[in-house]
């Protein structure tokens, strides 16, 4: 594994390339796969995210049964890539995801999930701020 800075730089660079393919930035759906997905709208890239997530699961199951573990990396890369397209569409970046992961650092997954349930219940209360 390379240094975190290198990982951050790679994600930031890829995010900039994806952002350059947004329709409002002149992305050309005739010459760019990313621009084509963005031009088609959320249903197109969200469908790809679902497909790629399924492929991650299948690669992991194969790896559990003696298959090539590097295929998990390949499929996760596809999933991350398509998730980054979604982030760009919604005006977000990988840095926003890292901030959220940092916020969760040191918090038990069980505790974090319990807090989400409490927050959801509070939001459902009559008179809750909308």
Curated annotation (Swiss-Prot):
Pathway: Amino-acid biosynthesis; L-histidine biosynthesis; L-histidine from 5-phospho-alpha-D-ribose 1-diphosphate: step 2/9. Transmembrane segments: none annotated. One of its GO terms (biological process) is L-histidine biosynthetic process. The keyword Amino-acid biosynthesis applies. Disulfide bonds: none annotated. GO terms for cellular component: cytoplasm. It comes from the Bacteria. It catalyses: 1-(5-phospho-beta-D-ribosyl)-ATP + H2O = 1-(5-phospho-beta-D-ribosyl)-5'-AMP + diphosphate + H(+). It is found in: Cytoplasm. CDD domains: NTP-PPase_HisIE_like (cd11534). GO terms for molecular function: ATP binding; phosphoribosyl-ATP diphosphatase activity. Keywords: Amino-acid biosynthesis, ATP-binding, Cytoplasm, Histidine biosynthesis, Hydrolase, Nucleotide-binding. Its main location: cytoplasm. Its EC number is 3.6.1.31. Belongs to the PRA-PH family. This is Phosphoribosyl-ATP pyrophosphatase. It comes from Albidiferax ferrireducens (strain ATCC BAA-621 / DSM 15236 / T118) (Rhodoferax ferrireducens). The lineage of its organism: Bacteria, Pseudomonadati, Pseudomonadota, Betaproteobacteria, Burkholderiales. The gene is hisE.
């Amino acid at each position: 594994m390379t240094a975190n800075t290198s990982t951050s730089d790679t994600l930031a660079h890829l995010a900039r390339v994806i952002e350059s393919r947004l329709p409002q930035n002149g992305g050309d759906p005739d010459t760019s796969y990313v621009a084509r997905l963005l031009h088609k709208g959320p249903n197109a890239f969200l469908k790809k995210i679902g497909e790629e997530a399924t492929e991650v699961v299948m690669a992991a199951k194969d790896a559990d049964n003696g298959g090539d573990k590097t295929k998990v990396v390949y499929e996760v890369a596809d999933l991350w890539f398509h998730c980054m397209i979604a982030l760009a569409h919604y005006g977000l970046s990988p840095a926003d995801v890292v901030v959220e992961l940092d916020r969760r650092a040191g918090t038990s997954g069980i505790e974090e999930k319990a807090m989400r349930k409490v927050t959801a219940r509070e939001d459902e209360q009559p008179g809750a701020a909308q």
